[in-house]
Regions:
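Extended, charge-enriched "interface" segments that sit outside catalytic cores
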Residues: 1-73, 319, 327-328, 336, ...
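Conserved phosphate-coordination/catalytic loops
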Residues: 59-63, 113, 241-245
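Short, charged beta->alpha transition segments
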Residues: 67-68, 116-125, 248-251, 406-412
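Glycine-rich phosphate-binding loops that contact phosphosugars or nucleotide phosphates
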Residues: 70-237, 311, 315-320, 326-336, ...
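Catalytic nucleophile loop
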Residues: 83, 454-456
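Active-site phosphate/pyrophosphate-binding segments
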Residues: 158-313, 352, 356-450, 454, ...
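Phosphate-binding beta-loop-alpha motif at adenosine-nucleotide cofactor sites
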Residues: 268, 342-348
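Conserved catalytic block of serine-dependent lipid acyl chemistry
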Residues: 325, 460
Length: 461
């Protein structure tokens, strides 16, 4: 995979940063799991670096995963429904939308919402008798997948013998979690215990991504092979020749220079990659009043409307229908915006990109002075949710929602460098996606600011 960079006046800063990273032996220290690359305190760092060795670990599991996939097909399952949130679901969703349904394999569906209409949509699509559910939660305590499990357990028990219901469920979780205990008590077909030193958003190349991928018929061996090739190049001490370190340096330098809106543009065949990478970037760098804002899925507009707070990364799949995107990238580059172009030879290069970005983001985090492996705001959101639910339990109603003024009034206070975040707490549909895309286009063209979009409660994770 080739990488081209058009960085303009930032090229000197990036070169100096790469030289500094090399002087400080940052690449070597990351592989040595030296927490001081990020913080003096090793808390939530040294026990979160298992992704560095994930390809070695998971290559040993390929035969077992393929055997389990055959077991599932032989059992007559036609649908696989993954119940998860955030890091447990976004990687599988990218794989699902990128590779589609494979002949002779069950159809993979990912449910990472507790919106009643979305749940009904999935439930109406499947036959529970022929469905295997993957309950994916690192901690085993995540509210949404636990609620979804309880719902679908009751659905399955309504159509099969109670003693057979457990055979329709598989757990993917950390060793010793409450989900491991529950799976044993309630007769799950299988439990995949993931290495506990891999954080959720870094887990796509572990059981969390590979189990649903294998069951859906994806070539997980090819995916891991590409990931391992990237891993090897990310061990290169020379920061300039290390693709993960190089990308991370560009991200960090741009953010420190006010270009903190990393805008991912991708070929049509891999345009869902942004679902996964936006969580990786946002949750890893967005803390302590600093961070990089990932912008994925924005409609293409004329280059004149983009502000000077952008860094563009173009994920280009060779052989895809790239004419429109290529033309847009040429115009963006010609306008003086910084652009990084990453060439992919085939869709299984996603494995390499998963690892490249997992390496790049911690490098960027080190330049920003943040710990890329903790998630304080996610925990705050969970605590706030528990408080709201407690209020409902005690009073029978939720706290009143305060609505703001009009959108026009809101946008009048927007400043250069601001961005608009759109969160839709509703079922995903082509119609909604089209409407939101056009809305984003109008915001960019009228106000010249970046936009992000996601479905809730996925966006909270």
């Amino acid at each position: 995979m080739n990488t081209e960079m058009s960085l303009g006046r930032y090229l000197v800063d990036v070169a100096a940063t790469l030289a500094d990273l090399e002087k400080r032996n940052v690449v070597q220290r990351i592989w040595q799991k030296d927490h001081t690359v990020w913080k003096p305190d090793p808390t939530e760092i040294t026990n979160r670096l298992g992704w560095l060795a994930v390809t070695d670990r998971m290559q040993e599991e390929i035969a077992g995963l393929e055997a389990f996939s055959k077991e599932v097909r032989d059992a007559g399952f036609q649908y696989i429904v993954l119940l998860g949130m955030g890091g447990s679901s976004l990687g599988p969703e990218v794989l699902r939308q990128t590779f589609g349904k494979r002949d002779g394999y069950p159809e993979l569906l990912v449910l990472d919402s507790i919106d009643p209409d979305w749940i009904k949509q999935v439930q109406d699509r499947i036959d529970p008798v022929q469905t295997l559910f993957l309950v994916a939660s690192k901690s085993g305590t995540t509210i949404e997948p636990n609620l979804l499990y309880e719902h679908f357990r009751s659905v399955v028990e309504s159509v099969v013998e109670p003693q057979a219901a457990g055979g329709h469920f598989v757990a993917i979780t950390d060793p010793g979690s409450t989900l491991v205990e529950r799976a044993g008590k309630e007769g799950f077909r299988k439990v995949f215990e993931n290495p506990s030193d891999i954080g959720g958003r870094y887990s796509v190349l572990s059981f969390f991504g590979l189990v649903p991928g294998a069951l859906a018929g994806e070539d997980i061996a090819a995916l891991l092979r590409k990931a391992d090739q990237m891993k090897q190049t990310c061990t290169i001490d020379s920061a300039t020749d290390n693709p993960g370190c190089q990308l991370g340096a560009v991200m960090g330098v741009m953010a420190l220079n006010g270009r903190d809106k990393l805008t991912l543009i991708a070929s049509p065949g891999v345009n869902r990659f942004g679902l996964w990478v936006e969580q990786l970037i946002a949750e890893s760098t967005g803390k302590e009043g600093k961070g990089i804002v990932p912008v994925a899925g924005e409609p293409l507009v004329d280059s004149q409307y983009y502000g000077d707070d952008r860094l563009f990364v173009y994920l280009r799949l060779n052989g895809d229908d790239n004419n429109e995107v290529d033309a847009a990238i040429r115009a963006i580059t010609d306008s003086g915006q910084p652009v990084v172009t990453i060439e992919m030879q085939d869709k299984y290069d996603l494995g390499a990109e998963f690892f490249r970005w997992e390496f790049a983001v911690p490098v960027a985090g080190s330049l920003l002075g943040s710990n890329p492996f903790d998630q304080p705001d996610v925990q705050k959101a969970k605590e706030a949710t528990k408080k709201v639910l407690q209020v409902h339990k005690e009073t029978g109603s939720f706290p009143a929602i305060e609505t703001g003024g009009s959108l026009v009034a809101l946008m009048e206070v927007a400043k250069p460098g601001s961005y608009v975040s759109i969160m839709a707490y509703m079922v995903e549909s082509d119609e909604t996606n089209t409407l939101i895309s056009e809305f984003r286009r109008k915001l960019i063209e009228r106000y010249g600011i970046a936009t992000t979009f996601g479905y809730g409660p996925r966006v909270l994770h």
